[in-house]
Amino acid sequence: MQGESLLPESAETEIGKRIINVIAGKRRLLIVNGGQSGVDRAALDSALKLMLPCRGWCPDQRWAEDGAIASHYPLTPCGSPTPAVRTELNAYDSDATLVLTRGAPTDGTNLTSDRALAHGRPVLILDLDEQPNVVQFWEWIRAHDVRILNVGGPRESFAPGVVYTRSRKILDLLLDPTR
């Protein structure tokens, strides 16, 4: 048993791919957001699935529209119950912001873009109803030397059953460091 891995072969293969990509210079992003239902939660779940680091500021009491944000998400209360404060902090603490939306951005999604731009951070807006171009996404990441990516967009209540599901599929595709 000595010298043998305790990991299942599938895990070893996945870990091996990630090591090769790190050696090859592929970038591993740190994902940041406030943990709201919808796009934020999809980004955190994608990061956790893909073993990418994630963090962010959330409102006090870990408030989200669907109740308290689960403790397994590594978020820090921002000292205010106001979602705009966490939006500001997450925009400031990142190198760039990716916004996923359906059609034209609305209220909180606009605030995310506005705050990022106010802090001189580039913003990329992708529509949830369109297939993203992975190559163009990574070219944008490299062009702006992004290491910390704020990800935002509408809450789940904007389009129940759609926002999280589509965001998750897109983010699993875009953020996968083995691609």
Predicted regions and their residues:
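Acidic/glycine-enriched connector segments
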Residues: 4-148, 153-177
